[in-house]
Swiss-Prot record:
Main localisation: nucleus
InterPro entries in the record: FAM124, FAM124_dom
Organism: Xenopus tropicalis (Western clawed frog)
Gene name of the record: fam124b
Protein localization: Nucleus
GO CC field: nucleus
Keyword line: Nucleus
Protein family according to the UniProt entry: Belongs to the FAM124 family.
Protein name, entry field: Protein FAM124B
PANTHER family: FAM124 DOMAIN-CONTAINING PROTEIN-RELATED, PROTEIN FAM124B
Length: 426
């Protein structure tokens, strides 16, 4: 549908036989496009099963339950009216030979009182001339004499607006209106003794916002046929569809839930991206280098890789080396001290923690490898930013051939106030 077209509160669904839906839709659009191009009142679709015909003898005469009347202005040109009239002469339109005037004489010329239809189970169409005013596309729902008052109240309840009464036994609702054209739904009362001929291949679909409060007010049961569509009928048997607008269907909720479950977990502080964290970390390392003049400090920026970081200290004999490609397993905690024991896939590494006096020793970075930090790489730069003064993690390992193990060494650093011993755990 064109985005410029206005959505009406009423849409007429025409159910065509298999293979006829496209031709029917083109025939209707070609006709109405020259009258009201900004709206689409009719939608044609194929019905799943053919209509079952029941032969029964009716004692009372029947009148079509739904009709479409086109009121065209004469002052806009006879050629335009003749063009629209010629469309009814082309297939798939068929001429309906019947007297629908209920005993009244036709006040217009005979061709304008002829009825046309796309199918015998669809509404009938006619054209009439008007001398002034706006042109009208009027969809008329006929009801029996006894059901007229109830039918008016029913459609007022569905449309949530009051009908405009023009004369006794006739009222209408304005669905769309401009200075040139008006689209209306009218309710017309039949004469006593005339029954309604229900059009089984036609359904009136109304857009509503809530169906819960409307269902108890309907004369017949309202059955859900989809997540957002309900079906019922009026007092004369005309099909009514209720489309709940602004409604999130169960399928949409399931799709949204599945999409939400696949989203990545947002870091604790999303306002600090990895690039800004790296810059802040590099600034702190540079300050530490100016203070203690280390020989070399290198920090791996690939947080998504779970390989350990290599640190080089001022003392050449104190180094913590980790070969690239070594993956960390799940960590364990020592039951006596509570410290974390880190295991590697191919070898064992021992992490040493040294503490110095913060008043006498210069500030440096404090990095801990724990279970939560290993699983969340973004915790590493957060730890580097928050540390203002801490101890240097040192360790040593002896490199060997395959099957060799790391050997632990114990380093002890003394200062004037505090002296702590570094512990190694397997």
């Amino acid at each position: 549908m064109d985005e410029r077209q206005t959505v009406l509160p009423l849409t007429v669904h025409l159910l065509a036989s298999s293979g006829d839906s496209l031709a029917f839709q083109l025939a209707v659009d070609r006709l109405l496009h020259r009258i009201c191009p900004d709206v689409r009142l009719f939608l044609v679709s194929e019905r799943a099963a053919p209509i079952k015909l029941y032969e029964c003898q009716t004692k009372r005469p029947e009148f079509p339950g739904i009709s479409v009347t086109l009121f065209l202005r004469e002052d806009l040109g006879e050629e335009r009216i003749d063009l629209l009239q010629s469309f009814f002469q082309l297939p798939p339109w068929t001429h309906v030979i019947a007297d629908f005037q209920q005993g009244r004489s036709c006040p217009f010329k005979l061709p304008l009182c002829d009825y046309y239809s796309l199918d015998s189970h669809m509404p009938v169409w006619e054209m009439r001339h008007v001398h002034y005013g706006t042109e009208i596309v009027r969809l008329t729902v006929y009801c029996s004499c006894d059901n007229y008052e109830d039918a008016v109240r029913l459609y007022e309840t569905i449309l949530q607006k009051e009908a405009t009464t023009q004369k006794a036994g006739f009222c209408f609702f304005v669905l769309y209106s401009t200075t040139h054209v008006s689209v209306q739904l009218s309710i017309k009362q039949l004469h006593p003794g005339i029954s309604v001929q229900v059009k089984d291949a036609c359904a009136l679909q109304f857009a509503i916002h809530a169906v819960g409060q409307l269902v108890p007010l309907l004369p017949y049961p309202c059955v859900p046929i989809s997540d957002a569509r309900w079906q019922t009928q009026d007092y004369d048997g005309n099909k009514i569809l209720l489309l709940v607008v602004d409604h999130t269907t169960a399928t949409q909720r399931k799709a949204e839930s599945k999409a939400a479950s696949t989203l990545m977990v947002i870091p604790d502080n999303p306002s600090l991206p990895f690039t800004s964290l790296n810059r802040s970390m590099e600034a702190k390392v540079q300050n530490a280098k100016d203070t203690i003049n280390p020989k070399n400090i290198s920090v791996s920026s690939n947080y998504l890789d779970q390989s350990e970081t290599i640190y080089n200290n001022t003392n050449p004999s104190q180094k913590l080396l980790a070969p690239h490609g070594i993956q960390m397993k799940e960590t364990e905690s020592n039951v006596d001290t509570g410290y974390t024991v880190v295991s590697l896939t191919s070898q064992q590494a021992y992490i040493c923690e040294l503490s110095e006096n913060q008043q006498s020793a210069p500030a440096f970075e404090d990095i801990y490898f724990s279970t939560s930090q290993r699983k969340s790489p973004q915790n590493l730069p957060f730890k580097l930013e928050e540390s203002s003064s801490s101890d240097v993690v040192e360790g040593s390992k002896a490199l060997g051939m395959t099957g060799s193990m790391f050997h632990s060494e114990r380093y002890q650093i003394h200062n004037s106030n505090i002296s702590e011993e570094e512990e190694f755990f397997i």
